[in-house]
């Protein structure tokens, strides 16, 4: 969860959705509540590591899982949990059949080193994927989905989402979306 900026954005976009968030650092949880406006009545926050949470979770499956697991030393971010085949499989098992998996990587090299490409094209649940990038950062977000989708479908969905369509019209959504390819 970090300081809760993604949780807050999701709460704005989807006001009637209950969000489950995991954060190991109690200071980040406090920041999310006090300074970033996370509505805790609509977000159930678990203070533990993502690995512990996923290993013990037996509740309802999720529509979307966002893996944004970073740590950093000397200002250099790196994944706190390796994006390996077993880790991706554990995340997949927590998704509903049509669920999406979004994974944040520090850069494209880190995405290439992960198990995402192998998992995407091994004939498993995910049939398509995208890499999302902003021109202002090196981060790459991989989106894995069970159905076949093209970038035109993604853009159409954005234009049909009221809050996002206004930002899209004003040129405020500066990003690139490309299909993940082997």
Each model region followed by its residue ranges:
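A short, terminal or domain-edge coil/loop segment
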Residues: 49-57, 75-81, 119-126, 151-168
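A generic structural signal for alpha->beta connector loops
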Residues: 16-18, 40-42, 98, 126, ...
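Low-complexity, flexible helical/coil segments
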Residues: 55-60, 82, 98-106, 137-141, ...
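The AdoMet/dcAdoMet-binding core of the Class I SAM-like
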Residues: 1-94, 110-111
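SAM/dcSAM-binding transferase cores
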Residues: 132-182
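Short, low-complexity, polar/charged sequence segments that are solvent-exposed and flexible
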Residues: 17-19, 39-42, 86, 121-122, ...
């Amino acid at each position: 969860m970090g300081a809760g900026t993604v949780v807050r954005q999701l709460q704005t976009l989807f006001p009637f959705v209950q969000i489950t968030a995991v954060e190991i650092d109690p200071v980040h949880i406090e920041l999310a509540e006090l300074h970033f406006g996370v509505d805790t009545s609509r977000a159930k926050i678990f203070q533990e590591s993502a690995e512990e949470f996923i290993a013990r979770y037996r509740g309802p499956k999720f529509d979307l899982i966002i893996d944004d697991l970073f740590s950093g030393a000397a200002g250099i971010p790196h994944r706190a949990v390796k994006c390996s085949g077993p880790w991706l499989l554990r995340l997949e098992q927590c998704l509903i059949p049509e669920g999406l998996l979004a994974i944040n990587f520090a850069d494209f090299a880190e995405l290439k080193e992960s198990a995402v490409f192998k998992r995407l094209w091994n004939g498993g649940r995910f049939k398509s994927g995208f890499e999302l990038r902003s021109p202002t950062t090196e981060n790459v977000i991989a989106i894995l989905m069970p159905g076949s989708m093209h970038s035109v479908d993604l853009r159409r969905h954005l234009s049909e989402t009221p809050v996002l369509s206004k930002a899209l019209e004003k040129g405020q959504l500066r990003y690139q979306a490309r299909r993940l390819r082997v």
